[in-house]
Amino acid sequence: MAPQVWRRRTLERCLTEVGKATGRPECFLTIQEGLASKFTSLTKVLYDFNKILENGRIHGSPLQKLVIENFDDEQIWQQLELQNEPILQYFQNAVSETINDEDISLLPESEEQEREEDGSEIEADDKEDLEDLEEEEVSDMGNDDPEMGERAENSSKSDLRKSPVFSDEDSDLDFDISKLEQQSKVQNKGQGKPREKSIVDDKFFKLSEMEAYLENIEKEEERKDDNDEEEEDIDFFEDIDSDEDEGGLFGSKKLKSGKSSRNLKYKDFFDPVESDEDITNVHDDELDSNKEDDEIAEEEAEELSISETDEDDDLQENEDNKQHKESLKRVTFALPDDAETEDTGVLNVKKNSDEVKSSFEKRQEKMNEKIASLEKELLEKKPWQLQGEVTAQKRPENSLLEETLHFDHAVRMAPVITEETTLQLEDIIKQRIRDQAWDDVVRKEKPKEDAYEYKKRLTLDHEKSKLSLAEIYEQEYIKLNQQKTAEEENPEHVEIQKMMDSLFLKLDALSNFHFIPKPPVPEIKVVSNLPAITMEEVAPVSVSDAALLAPEEIKEKNKAGDIKTAAEKTATDKKRERRKKKYQKRMKIKEKEKRRKLLEKSSVDQAGKYSKTVASEKLKQLTKTGKASFIKDEGKDKALKSSQAFFSKLQDQVKMQINDAKKTEKKKKKRQDISVHKLKL
């Protein structure tokens, strides 16, 4: 008892843990590390528990315990697979053995007894039917083959054994679905009407089916004879009102007449197999085949024209073909009568609308559709590649990296190597070998001493010079005098050397292909406005230096920069111009004031026009006459409402007092000062 209690407790504990975890499934939306560790420990418990209870027959994993420590999820899964794969194989083999054993049943004993009773009743009924059949066969066949009855009886008994009766309750207990389907098929066959078996019957041929088929053919021939008798009464010389009457006449013939051997199909020999997929496929084909309907309509028109001239038999065959085509086009749905009539009405309306349209109308429809699609393409927003000049702000980010760009390289292209060029080169080389002209290109070497080497020789010494300033000047003076004495040469020789150098330079420029221009003379002299190209390039003497100058060298750049139009000016440029105008205005006012003061000093009569006294007198005269009026400050006597106004007024008064006091002090000082010129003798 103790081990059983222990087993039950371990399983109950595992179930409670799993129940707690699955009780709140919303927790699994986030990562639950605690639950994960708990589940791994549960798997270990169950694995170890299973290993303890294993029999000797079941050989699972060789590991007696599941190892979890320092193992990741994949390694734990691999340990479980080692255990599960052989056990699953063992159970599959065991189940297949039990299924093959017919004596084993999953039903309870009470139901088995009921099934046996039902089976015995069915066997009794079937025995009676078999006896009746045997008597009929004996009466029909005589003593030809007495063993056939016994064979039939044995086969029926074996069928009854194989087909036990199943109830609705049994379906919940039996799990072999394929076996159930086979047994139900056998039952259905047994329930059908038993047919008479003959000696000729085998797996493919049955005499009873052939007799039934012949009887059906005889009945159809009798119907044909009746129809022929009715057709003899029809007057073929009677006038026909319209095509509809003709169609109705021949339609009756089609319905009554049988099909020819050329038009027989699978459904004429075997029962039709109906399925929803076939119906939907036919419906889709009908809706998607407008062009095919037009072609079929044209073929029908041709057939009608041919049928008027052909004989009656040919006409009947053409009508049968048309009937077959129409039957293919028809779609039948398992709907009630009202719904069926509505659907057929809608389909007929669509067909009629399609049939009414002429070829010109169809062409116009296609053309209109094409025009609409082209207009839509033209009106839609074009991609940035087709919008002309596009800046980086207008196109999407990193879109230029996906494009292959074509741009020109300003580089001289290498000559194309052809047969002609190679032959020319070979001829030149051969000719030089014949002439023994081995004068290879002279190797040019860079001069060891740079032209501006003197710049490198100047060393900067950060230490304070120990020499005095007088000593430094003395040394510089001595160096200059020594150089002058050392460099004294014959002036005629110097002149001849200069002339020869200039001549050889011009001759080299004209004759030598690999000409190196004369390097610049190292002079500590800044030459302004000298074109840089003169010393690096050999140009003809007739060309002036002005043609080689850059635009900036011809005309100096404005300090403010390039001249801009009003549209090109920025906010800073506009502000700069405004400040400049204000400054000029201020300067004009200052100059005007200076001129006025000079006039006052020089001549009082001329300056009287602009003096303050004259202006004040004129104002008084104007006020007396009434032409002008003074604007008085009437707000002085009024009381101040705010503290800010009071303190501002007080501050102004104090400033005025301070300024008056300073002026008086300056006047006193001026009076006290005595000039030196007055004290001169």
Swiss-Prot record:
Ranges of Basic residues composition bias in the record: 253-264, 576-598
Annotated Polar residues bias: 180-190
Modified residues (N6-acetyllysine): 609
GO terms, biological process: maturation of SSU-rRNA; ribosomal small subunit biogenesis; RNA processing; RNA splicing; RNA splicing, via transesterification reactions
GO terms, molecular function: RNA binding
InterPro entries: Mpp10
Biased composition (Acidic residues): 105-147, 227-247, 291-318
Coiled coil: 109-138, 205-239, 284-324, 348-382, 469-490, 574-604, 648-670
Keyword Disulfide bond: no
Post-translational modification: Phosphorylated in M (mitotic) phase.
Family note: Belongs to the MPP10 family.
UniProt-recorded name of the protein: U3 small nucleolar ribonucleoprotein protein MPP10
Organism, as annotated: Homo sapiens
Gene giving rise to this polypeptide: MPHOSPH10
